[in-house]
Amino acid sequence: MKEFWQTCVSRLEQELPPQQISAWIRPLVPLAYDEAQAVLRVAAPNRFKLDWVRKNFSHQIEALAAEWYQRPVQVQFELPSHSTTPRIPVTPRAAVAPVAPASAAPLAPAAPPVAAAYSAPPEPPAAPAQTSAAVDAANIVYERSRLNTDLTFENFVTGKANQLARAAALQVAENPGTSYNPLFLYGGVGLGKTHLIHAIGNAMVAAGTGVRVRYVHADQYVSDVVKAYQRKAFDDFKRYYHSLDLLLIDDIQFFSGKNRTQEEFFYAFEAMVAQRKQIIITSDTYPKELSGIDSRLISRFDSGLTVAIEPPELEMRVAILLRKAESEGVPMPEEVAFFIAKHLRSNVRELEGALRKVLAYARFHGREALNVDVCKEALKDLLSVSNGQITVENIQKTVADFYKIKVADMYSKRRPANIALPRQVAMYLAKELTQKSLPEIGDLFGGRDHTTVLHAVRKISDARAKQAELNHTLHVLEQTLKG
């Protein structure tokens, strides 16, 4: 048991960065190996580390254990009991004799004992009170961070729609507080903004550098400001938020009209950026399109890196469905994933909801194998909505609502900028999303000539290729119209 664990750690040192070894592997304590059941019991110091190691490293440890014991082994992680448990020492890598590459040195009990390479004496067991205090402290830190450990870079499905956002998020996780500060991610509901910012937080915590992290939804931040005001505790409020190394603010559009909240956030923003501490913000829209937000804040948001997350393309939607089905332990044929992805195009949340509906339908109706017919039956309500005809009238109403103008302005002869652009956008979408000819579209826009429609289509098409903000707006409108 002792020899196996030392060898296991040595092998993991060859595969993982030193920070991950220090943060996640060294704190683990092997408790016992049950030969009859082929179960290896390993203790983690607190619930946060237990959950993280189980999700991210259990497969590697189980593979090494299976190689050592020459049979499949289940690794069972648990929290330490209050009784003391002897700790198997693991000395830093510098004290270890050179180890051959993993492929050249198979694990086997007959190999020379790896523990012989260690000269350090065993560490004394931690006292129960100290262990309990450490667990409590770690849990408190984790609770304060509010991170969801399920949301990582490893299980984030990447495609054209979000590859730039993921690349920026990875860069920030590896080099916080430098060039991309703040990082501002924007896009529609259910496209993965929240997943990405949790992934950044989890990656920084996993690096084991002791960073102080806080994820907070904008509504909760507003609530924190109100409580600080009621309790006359603004000094404590400022001290806490200004002390963070990483602040993740989700859905900042909810700050709209809340002047005191915006003022406090402005002070926190200035203090953190001055100390090269990282701020990451998400929103449903581009910074300059935020309403009810102080211009000073909008200027600060624009000072870093702003990245859009677009609705997922077909291939990405298929990959998301296959990954989700795999995580649920359900084999899904690709043609089934393609069928769902072709008919549901708006966001990741909708896709996952549709998959849950299909799985539940199959389970309740005794359908063992997933196929397209099962999907059609399970999703008939959703499919009837998503297959609805897109009309020019529907486009005009949707665009008018988005730009906050009257539908009648679509037909009028008025040409101020706040009306001309939405009208051209609506003409462009009518050409892209319906079978109407240019003259027919012109008639539906107040009897305009087909050359006017053609000019609008070309103008918006060219602008879309050059302006990220307009491209994002068009994506939002297209997905809204397609359902």
Swiss-Prot record:
Domain of life of the source: Bacteria
Protein name, as recorded: Chromosomal replication initiator protein DnaA
Entry-linked NCBIfam families: DnaA (TIGR00362)
Gene Ontology CC, one term: cytoplasm
Compartment annotation: Cytoplasm
Function: Plays an essential role in the initiation and regulation of chromosomal replication. ATP-DnaA binds to the origin of replication (oriC) to initiate formation of the DNA replication initiation complex once per cell cycle. Binds the DnaA box (a 9 base pair repeat at the origin) and separates the double-stranded (ds)DNA. Forms a right-handed helical filament on oriC DNA; dsDNA binds to the exterior of the filament while single-stranded (ss)DNA is stabiized in the filament's interior.
GO MF term (any one): lipid binding
Domain comment in the entry: Domain I is involved in oligomerization and binding regulators, domain II is flexibile and of varying length in different bacteria, domain III forms the AAA+ region, while domain IV binds dsDNA.
Annotated stretches, region: Domain II: 71-145
Keyword list, A-Z: ATP-binding, Cytoplasm, DNA replication, DNA-binding, Lipid-binding, Nucleotide-binding
One Pfam family named in its UniProt record: Bac_DnaA
Oligomer and partners: Oligomerizes as a right-handed, spiral filament on DNA at oriC.
Record region (Domain III, AAA+ region): 146-362
Annotated region (Domain IV, binds dsDNA), positions in chain: 363-483
Annotated family: Belongs to the DnaA family.
Region (Domain I, interacts with DnaA modulators): 1-71
Broad class of where this protein is predominantly found: cytoplasm
Keyword tRNA processing among UniProt keywords: no
Residue ranges of the TM segments: none
Binding site for ATP: 190, 192-194
Listed InterPro entries: AAA+_ATPase, Chromosome_initiator_DnaA, Chromosome_initiator_DnaA-like, Chromosome_initiator_DnaA_CS, DnaA_C, DnaA_dom, DnaA_N_dom, DnaA_N_sf
Any one of the GO BP annotations: DNA replication initiation
